[in-house]
From Swiss-Prot:
It comes from Saccharomyces cerevisiae (strain ATCC 204508 / S288c) (Baker's yeast). Induction: Upon SUB2 overexpression. The lineage of its organism: Eukaryota, Fungi, Dikarya, Ascomycota, Saccharomycotina. Belongs to the helicase family. Yeast subtelomeric Y' repeat subfamily. Residues 2-44 form the Helicase C-terminal domain. This is Putative uncharacterized helicase-like protein YBL112C.
Amino acid sequence: MQVLIGTKLVTEGIDIKQLMMVIMLDNRLNIIELIQGVGRLRDGGLCYLLSRKNSWAARNRKGELPPIKEGCITEQVREFYGLESKKGKKGPACWMLWLQDRPVC
């Protein structure tokens, strides 16, 4: 099994065959970077984002896209692209993000 561990730089330009897991540490990803990172996976692989709750908010700079939020990523992608949301319905593509409020080791 191929596993990729890295910063948000792994979201751009890397193509690894049979990649089944991506682990990104203490990142401040926005929706575009998240989509690029998850796009590296094949055949239902897993993506783990590990960070502290206040690490993203503290580093957000003026003019950048807002970082992703804890909760349903599918809804955030729909909002970003201006797509209609079906409130209360979570299909198989909806996956959740929980941020840890403790140091990442």
